[in-house]
């Protein structure tokens, strides 16, 4: 099957925004106008094409980035709709990594919102060119120029309107095109009746002023255009378009357009802008990778002639075909039924079928080419971030980095039947989502799930119920404490049972002392003269290791201590490995009174980004959570507070930050180190664990 669309005519774009800015609706309209769907689904009615998981339709938010393909004016546009909620940033990270360009959707009333800033930062990290679509122009309080102002103030981005709205709110009925110097008026609500007219008299002055600003901004980035501009020569529409395209694809300039996706206004013009200004796979730098054995850096150009290389960016479990692996082809061609190498894992994989996805319907294709996004069926070992490549020409592409989970809860199946299904469900869900982990707690036997936030884990439990029919009870969030010793001491452990029959006898003297942080447990044998026979010494070490798993104060694992076996005695007949194991654990218990044991807690490095006016409240809040503020800096017109806060005090923080800053603050946290718990808190923990 020959290539249907050339590489120049391919666009891989993402639609990104703050929750509720209307990006799913915008994607819906794109699919409607490009002829992919015949009836438009409304998000608020729960019938949207892109939001196809049940929870998404109920909550009216997008959780997984659905990938879909559309066609417009001889071009193929692959679209990935991303979620806007902060707990799902991993989805946004994944999709940005494989896109060439993006459309940032803003709400015309609010302009740039907190999650917009987070997503914008991620897009800047990956160097993704962007167009800004100011949506909801029909909404009460919509203000286009205010929204453009927020892009400058909150994102420090070089963004300029290439359109102006005609009217706003109920009166929004047209768009002025500053590049082509014309206007588009809308006759009906389906947006199909569009008339291209001259710019209305009353808007001419404003349009001229903004066109002048646009030309000046583009000319600043293009020497040839600058010369013409300074000499007062006329700059043609073609030159201006080429200048905007060049500046946008090099991520130096961001065109701003407007519309109302819900009222079907401005969507076709948005599609035109995607084609005119966002890059094709040929316009972005060639992807870099390394050769597995030599670590030599190589490039893969976007071309069908190059060896095959692709990045798996998402795994999904589909009710009909099983495991789907979404991948972006960077170079070469792939046929269904062929073999590829997963160079990240060093495994050979067979690509059974290749599907082109459209929200939740699919079409089977036999070949994918450079620049395409598709889904493969039949890959067994591939997970998110893995590279798939030609077996004869190995390469590992730069993968994505995912943060460690910060919150965990215990989860229990409601019945025996649920228990059997729960293991399968958890392993499939952790395959799909690299920031979600599940493990069994050795001490309690409970299943613990960990993720990026409270909403994240809610959704996971919800998906277990719906997709895997597993009912489960969820416990309260838990913190992983540790214990350690602060003082050194020599203690005795003696186990003797010698009443009738064969007895048990083990006797040890052990010196305990604190070890450096992060060094774990170290055991040393200092026995001289055979007072404890050599065959029993490993048993002493093993006995201590077992006893350390359930600490001495509150039952948490003991970390970072040294133990040296210095003396002891044995009995020819009654001594055994078991007896020495028990003697060692008795010595550890005896150490409690002498070694000054303490509880350690995980400390999180927290970064809070807030508008300046909330600074006082946030600093007070951090201190009340036993946090230490370690630094502050201005970022644009926002303030960044960096602090070290105990994880146990961070539960519910997202909600409290939201209410303290009217939703304008965002925060991120990562684990940093373990630190001693203050005495008052330590007493509370011990009481709680002893059930007092």
Curated annotation (Swiss-Prot):
What are the recorded GO MF terms, alphabetically? GTP binding; GTPase activity; translation elongation factor activity
Query: Which InterPro entries does the protein's record reference?
Result: EFG_II, EFG_III, EFG_III/V, EFG_IV, EFG_V, EFG_V-like, EFTu-like_2, G_TR_CS
Can you give the residue ranges of the tr-type G domain? 8-282
Checking CDD domains in the record gives: EF-G, EFG_III, EFG_mtEFG1_IV, EFG_mtEFG_C, EFG_mtEFG_II
* Amino-acid positions noted as binding GTP in the UniProt annotation, renumbered to this chain: 17-24, 81-85, 135-138
Tree of life domain: Bacteria
Q: Which GO terms describe its cellular component?
A: cytoplasm
Q: Name one GO biological process term.
A: ribosome disassembly
Where in or outside the cell is it found? Cytoplasm
- What keywords tag this UniProt record? Cytoplasm, Elongation factor, GTP-binding, Nucleotide-binding, Protein biosynthesis
Coarse class of the protein's main subcellular location: cytoplasm
Gene3D superfamilies linked: 3.30.230.10, 3.30.70.240, Elongation Factor G (Translational Gtpase), domain 3, P-loop containing nucleotide triphosphate hydrolases, Translation factors
The role this protein plays is: Catalyzes the GTP-dependent ribosomal translocation step during translation elongation. During this step, the ribosome changes from the pre-translocational (PRE) to the post-translocational (POST) state as the newly formed A-site-bound peptidyl-tRNA and P-site-bound deacylated tRNA move to the P and E sites, respectively. Catalyzes the coordinated movement of the two tRNA molecules, the mRNA and conformational changes in the ribosome.
Q: Which HAMAP family match?
A: EF_G_EF_2_B
Q: Which family does it belong to?
A: Belongs to the TRAFAC class translation factor GTPase superfamily. Classic translation factor GTPase family. EF-G/EF-2 subfamily.
- Name of the featured protein: Elongation factor G
Q: Which organism is it from?
A: Bacillus anthracis (strain CDC 684 / NRRL 3495)
**GN (gene name):** fusA
